[in-house]
Amino acid sequence: MKYLSLFSGIGGFELGIQQANMCQPKCVGYSEIDKYAIQVYNKQFNHKNYGDITKINASTLPDFELLIGGFPCQSFSIAGKRGGFNDTRGTLFFDVARVLKEKQPRLCLLENVKGLLSHEQGATFRTIISTLDELGYDCQWQVLNSKNFGVPQNRERVFIVGHLRGTSRPEVFPIGGADREDTRNVGEDLSYTIDANYSKGTNTLEKGRRQLIKGDTAIRRLTPKECERLQGFPDDWTKEGMDGLISDTQRYKMCGNSVTVPVIKEIINKLINY
């Protein structure tokens, strides 16, 4: 299956696809502007970077069957009760939508923070779903927590799967059940969410996020390698880029911005069964 990656970061979606049972996945390109993330991505993958999504001419993109990406949560200027494609102008989701409108891939998989569901009293999420509906996509979604996918991190994200009407409908959600590997019983070993501002924290507890763990003799911060593990990446995934070593500050940021790889793997495995 050919896919296009947007807001690609360090390649969490791509690694999840690699680990899934997809037959001969091929990335036709990715879009990323953070220079450190690009360095890491290019060290791990040999894909073309189309750069700033706002400057991509969608008509020049190769054809693909699946669009993937985690876009920022932004407010829309909604003129009426039902937001649509035109109401998303000025946001990065608009650029996702215009690529979908131009290329009409069979499937899309989008990720965002759980707060998207309640942002602006739910108006933001309604506009996103209405826009996808306007573009011909039926959608399903679910909030998934990384702790239920074999990593000890309490990280909730909403995932949206859209399928083009007239094509086979993948029944992806709900995901979960009694047979789900769950790390809730690890107690004190469960980390709170790693976010992009982790490196700015001190040895305190802020905003409900536990940034410290108990060592053998003292309390300490997580290391970048441990943050990689909590997101399901191999050790030292972010340690080096194409131009050499990456600072710990940037490694914390990139891990915090990434998706959790095992979650993507599970979703992709559900997608490709249809």
Give the predicted meaning of each segment.
Residues 39, 126, 130, 265-269, ...:
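A broad, structural surface signal
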Residues 75-77, 109, 243-249:
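Short glycine/proline-rich turn/loop motifs
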Residues 107-113, 142, 245:
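Short beta-strands and strand-loop turn motifs
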Residues 113-118, 146-150:
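Short histidine/acidic/glycine/proline-rich micro-motifs that form metal-
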